[in-house]
A protein has these predicted regions:
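Non-catalytic beta-sheet/beta-sandwich ligand-binding modules that flank or precede catalytic cores
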Residues: 1-191
Length: 191
């Protein structure tokens, strides 16, 4: 009989939304084949990102697990989970400490239905977010004068001096001829 539970042995976390860079995913490798059929066998709330193995930063509840029976499990983080992870990472935008992952008992099971045991402080290889955000849409409220910009990922507006309205122009075409340069420095972040 199978008496050895699955153990997490390595992992990679990608902070970049680009599919070629990993696409906001955590890829975990295990010591033996895990049962991912159906994928609902994965209890995603048992996966916790940590800065030092002790202080929890992000419980991955709400993330999406994918994979087939095998040695790897892929977890796609939500945008807010990705942002919180970047802040505690050893990549640009982070605090230099690096991300680790903790596992509660019962996150996955092997083919013999043995669940993983609790495990802490697994170091993750980090892939930096190197892709610039893309402007997806914009809207002007002519009654209030508020310009709302929507981007492909979270924009760091803390402190607000990181946003430079003077570098933005409003116009009817992609060139700057006839465009109006923004000068007001009132910036408000909205999730």
């Amino acid at each position: 009989p199978d008496i050895t539970p699955p153990n997490f042995v390595s992992g990679t976390i990608s902070y970049d939304d680009s599919i070629s860079s990993g696409g906001r995913r955590i890829i975990l490798t295990l010591s033996e084949t895990i049962d991912l059929t159906p994928i609902s066998l994965v209890n995603i709330s048992c996966f916790i990102l940590s800065e030092n193995g002790v202080d929890d930063i992000v419980i991955l509840d709400g993330a999406t697990a994918t994979g087939i029976d095998g040695l790897t499990l892929t977890i796609e983080m939500t945008e807010s989970q990705r942002v919180l992870s970047v802040l505690a990472s050893n990549t640009p935008g982070g605090d230099g400490s690096g991300i680790r992952i903790n596992f509660l008992k019962g996150g996955v099971q092997d083919i013999g239905t043995l669940q993983n045991l609790a495990q802490t402080n697994l170091s993750l290889t980090e892939i930096a977010d190197v892709r610039s955000p893309t402007l997806l849409s914009q809207a002007i409220d002519y009654d209030t004068g508020i310009l709302t910009l929507t981007f492909s990922e979270t924009i760091d507006t803390t402190p607000k001096s990181l946003v430079i309205p003077g570098s933005m122009y409003i116009g009817q075409t992609s060139n700057l001829a006839g465009a109006v340069q923004l000068t007001e420095d009132t910036t408000t972040a909205v999730n």
